[in-house]
A protein has these predicted regions:
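A short acidic, Gly/Pro-enriched loop at the edge of an enzyme's catalytic core
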Residues: 102-114
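A short glycine-rich, Lys/Arg-flanked "PGG" loop and its adjoining helix->strand segment in the class I
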Residues: 129-141
Length: 226
């Protein structure tokens, strides 16, 4: 079995992908669910947002266009560089940082809204828990966390090589050659404690069988995760 820190490595594959126009092509438009929640929160006073795993900046740019003060982080230098160039072209004052989801360079209780779309399942359970602990730390009380996790209904769950509990790699399958963690809705709720899950849907993405858990959660307690 791999050490936790050895499993959060998928950003290396994405770093290569973000260097090419072909690799960036499908990741330029913000998700409709993200737009929905960001607009709703903005209407009730949310102002500080973090785009965790920002990639090439599709959601960071949208959030900035909505008037949010945006802090955007990704492990990929290529992704951050491209996102920063787009923000400069569009004159969006976004603060971009290269870093890891398990060690967020932010003060406690900094954000009203934190987005991690297709991000925090890149690693084993310990990596997920560390990332959630950091997310909980930087959210303000009442802050909203929106994102996705890989569902155990996903057609890839249980295939490939299991490198840790519910964590699989698929040799030669681009970012799937890096560890991916899967869970069901009950396990998701346990991982998120003490955050409160407000919405969970098990939805297919672009390809048949590509189920992901789409969630919205709220920080309701002041204590850190265990």
């Amino acid at each position: 079995m791999l050490r936790p820190e050895a499993t959060a490595t998928a950003y290396r594959e994405w770093d290569e992908r973000w260097k090419t126009e072909t690799g960036r092509r499908d990741w330029l438009k913000p998700e409709s669910e993200v737009k929905e929640i960001a607009e709703l929160l903005g209407n009730i006073g949310a102002s500080a947002a973090m785009d965790l795993g920002c990639g090439i900046g599709r959601h960071s740019l949208f959030l900035a266009s909505m008037g949010y003060s945006v802090f955007a982080l990704d492990g990929s230098n290529a992704g951050v560089d491209f996102a920063r160039s787009l923000a400069q072209e569009q004159m969006r004052p976004i603060h971009f940082v290269t870093g890891l989801m398990t060690d967020l360079p932010c003060a406690d209780e900094s954000f009203d809204y934190l987005l991690a779309w297709n991000v925090i399942y890149h690693g084993n359970r310990d990596v997920v828990r560390r990332s959630l602990s950091e997310i909980h730390r930087v959210l303000r009380p009442g802050g909203i966390f929106q994102g996705t996790m890989l569902s155990k209904n996903n057609h890839l769950f249980g295939h490939g090589r299991e490198v840790a509990a519910d964590t699989f790699v698929f040799e030669g399958e681009l970012d799937k050659s890096h560890p991916h963690f899967y869970c069901n809705q009950t396990e998701l709720a346990a991982l998120f404690d003490p955050m409160e899950l407000l919405r969970v849907n098990d939805l297919e993405h672009e390809h048949p069988g590509s189920y992901h858990l789409h969630f919205v959660a709220m920080k309701t307690h002041l204590q850190d995760l265990e």
